[in-house]
UniProtKB/Swiss-Prot annotation:
GO terms for biological process: symbiont-mediated suppression of host innate immune response; symbiont-mediated suppression of host JAK-STAT cascade via inhibition of STAT1 activity; symbiont-mediated suppression of host JAK-STAT cascade via inhibition of STAT2 activity; symbiont-mediated suppression of host type I interferon-mediated signaling pathway; viral transcription. It comes from Mokola virus. Non catalytic polymerase cofactor and regulatory protein that plays a role in viral transcription and replication. Stabilizes the RNA polymerase L to the N-RNA template and binds the soluble protein N, preventing it from encapsidating non-genomic RNA. Also inhibits host IFN-alpha and IFN-beta signaling by binding and retaining phosphorylated STAT1 in the cytoplasm or by inhibiting the DNA binding of STAT1 in the nucleus. It holds the Pfam family PP_M1. InterPro entries: PP_M1-like (IPR004259), PP_M1_C (IPR037199), RABV_P-like_C (IPR049506). This is Phosphoprotein. One of its GO terms (molecular function) is RNA-directed RNA polymerase activity.
């Protein structure tokens, strides 16, 4: 047999490539036709148009009548209560949040504490909301108070008469007790704010060392490495568990450096089966206690 013969598999491969090329060309032609569909009509020559064509306007009479009727029905007082898209207060507020967020990230990258950055950030947001967003609401409340002042004065006069008549009754002393119920609410709100700030400081320090590996004693009288990523937990869950470590809340409140190896070992012993299998639990417990004692001693020396 001659060596110039072509193998049948090569012929089949060439036929397949030809078919694919034909399909590709058909697809390209269809795409070109669809993109040039607006050019398939009769051409319009600008020179053939009349001179006054630029002054002509095409209007829909039915739509125009509907809009005119709607404009007549709506009063000017109702139009003042609605803002157009250009006057939406949320757009500049979003821009403000983006700006201060970028500044906060820069401050955190420079090494500034999370507690200080967050307190300054919250003050800026409160100031912006009180000056730019709450102004319209305050105007509405002032107008309502001015309108209701006469009726309020009459009702207050009647109430003063009733109080003067009932002052001599000893059973009415309960009604004149001072409003001390407001104080616990304020204290609880401040306590919640402080707890959120402390948790934020813990989350910041844990997130910075999320992939850093720490040494722990193993069962084989050696050591092994472990980090927060191997816990397979959310940052919020890690922070909640870390708040149970003695002394962590106090150190975070003072803005000091947290015992991260102690926190990692405490959370891992509580939530990771693999860590408990690898680690010598007694030695890890002693290691946690030693870290707590050393960090608390440093905090007392700093105070």
């Amino acid at each position: 047999m001659s060596k110039d013969l072509v193998h049948p598999s090569l012929i089949r491969a060439g036929i397949v490539e030809l078919e694919m090329a034909e399909e590709t060309t058909d697809l390209i032609n269809r795409t070109i036709e669809s993109n040039q569909a607006h050019l398939q009509g009769e051409p319009l020559y600008v020179d053939s148009l009349p001179e006054d064509m630029s002054r002509l306007r095409i209007e829909d009479k039915s739509r125009r009548t509907k809009t005119e009727e709607e404009e007549r029905d709506e009063g000017s007082s109702e139009e003042d209560n609605y803002l157009s898209e250009g006057q939406d207060p949320l757009i500049p507020f979003q821009n403000f949040l983006d700006e201060i967020g970028a500044r906060a990230v820069k401050r955190l990258k420079t090494g500034e504490g999370f507690f200080r950055v967050w307190s300054a950030l919250s003050d800026d947001i409160k100031g912006y909301v009180s000056t730019n967003i709450m102004t319209s609401g305050e105007r509405d409340t002032k107008s309502i108070q001015i309108q209701t002042e006469p009726t309020a004065s009459v009702s207050s006069g009647n109430e003063s008469r009733h109080d003067s008549e009932s002052m001599h009754d000893p059973n009415d002393k309960k009604d004149h007790t001072p409003d001390h119920d407001v104080v616990p609410d304020i204290e609880s709100s401040t306590d919640k704010g402080e707890i959120r700030d402390i948790e934020g400081e813990v989350a910041h320090q844990v997130a910075e060392s999320f992939s850093k590996k720490y040494k722990f004693p193993s069962r084989s009288s050696g050591i092994f490495l472990w980090n927060f990523e191997q816990l397979k937990m959310n940052l919020d869950d890690i922070v909640k568990a870390a708040m149970n470590v003695p002394g962590v809340e106090r150190i975070a409140e003072k803005g000091g450096k947290l015992p991260l190896r102690c926190i990692l070992g405490f959370v891992a012993l509580d939530s990771s089966k693999r860590f408990r299998l690898l680690a010598d639990n007694d030695k890890v417990a002693r290691l946690i206690q030693e870290d707590i004692n050393s960090y608390m001693a440093r905090l007392e020396e700093a105070e």
